[in-house]
Design a protein with these regions (language model features):
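An N-terminus-focused feature that recognizes amino-terminal "leader" regions
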Residues: 1-93, 175, 183-261, 286-296
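Short, isolated positions within intrinsically disordered regulatory regions of eukaryotic proteins
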Residues: 28, 63-66, 100, 270, ...
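Hydrophobic, ordered structural segments
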Residues: 80-164, 280
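Short glycine/proline-enriched turns and hinge-like loops at secondary-structure junctions
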Residues: 87, 265-268
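Hydrophobic, aromatic-enriched interface-forming segments
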Residues: 143-205
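C-terminal structured domains
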Residues: 267-296
Length: 296
């Protein structure tokens, strides 16, 4: 896939000035879109069912709440080497777990302790021994299994993305500020309808939005800025600077959309997002991943 030839790049060339179209194309990032597997297509990932776990790895539990639900698994070897801009393992499986509670018994928004307890990423290297399907603990109903294949796509930054704000926003504003927002710089499209129609068409063609790498697709504000708050909470200058620095290195590992086929509904058609620092991903330190979720 050549990002410069993607529908998102073409939308920039059509609705932006030549200078801004080039900036836009440089902001696009490759992502690995996960869609339902069809006959003859490779199995890349799956939702729900019984996860494949080594015998010596315990099912993740949130102390005081209970076992986490298995959400998804992704085969790192199925991503064409070097095609994503994040340092994924070249082999092995990544498994994602989430405590699917409600109210006060749920993973709380931007609460570091809740996120650490109620979400988990487990990496199973290809060399792991005694790997077998693991039944969910008694009383935990697994989500239905959905088999997924994958394809490389271009992904676009949202209006609150720090890089987009830096490229097209007010130079006097701080791109990393929580409330910074900028419109896409359309020309000859006064209300932006043509450009947004192109974005909407592309997104509709790639729904549900299960994705490895690339830009996150938010439901309600910047995913990366929210996740940074979960790592460095607080309103003081030290916390704000720590979040600003983190945004330079924080990347989305995976997003899992609501999906009726797997009986997954995160709030009101929401999404789950796992993020991680590039250096932690390269070091395979998945216990340092963070998380947020959004809903309409």
């Amino acid at each position: 896939m050549d990002i410069s030839e993607s529908p998102l790049a073409e939308a920039g060339r059509r609705f932006f000035s030549a200078e801004n179209a080039q900036k836009w194309i440089e902001l696009l990032r490759p992502g690995y879109h996960l869609r339902e597997q069809q006959q003859g297509e490779p199995l890349v990932a799956y939702l729900g069912g019984d996860p494949m776990l080594p015998a010596d790895v315990e099912w993740p539990v949130w102390e005081g709440h209970g076992p986490l639900s298995f959400i998804a698994a992704f085969d790192c070897e199925e991503v064409p080497p070097g095609r994503l801009d994040i340092p994924l393992p070249e082999s092995g499986m990544l498994l994602f777990f989430y405590f699917n509670g409600v109210g006060q018994d749920a993973v709380q928004y931007l609460d570091p302790d809740s996120i650490r307890g109620g979400t988990r990423v487990i990496y199973v290297p290809e060399t792991s021994e005694n790997v077998a399907p693991r039944k969910a603990p008694e009383g935990l109903e697994p989500f239905p299994r959905v088999m997924l294949t994958g394809e490389l796509i271009a992904t676009a930054p949202d209006n609150e993305n720090a890089a987009l704000v830096a490229a097209f926003g007010d130079p006097a504003e701080d791109p990393a500020a929580d409330d910074d927002y900028t419109e896409y710089p359309t020309v000859g499209d006064a209300d932006g309808d043509g450009f947004y129609d192109a974005l909407t068409t592309f997104r509709r063609d790639h729904s549900p939005h299960h994705r490895v790498g690339g830009h996150s697709l938010p439901k309600a504000g910047s995913v990366e800025k929210e996740a940074a708050h979960a790592v460095f909470p607080g309103a003081d200058d030290t916390a704000r600077q720590a979040r600003r620095d983190l945004l330079k290195d924080l990347v989305m590992l995976i997003q899992i959309d609501s999906d009726a086929r797997a009986a997954m509904e995160w709030g009101d058609t929401g999404r789950l997002y796992w993020l991680i620092r590039r250096e932690d991903l390269a070091a395979r330190e998945f216990d340092k991943a963070t998380f947020t979720w959004q809903s309409e």
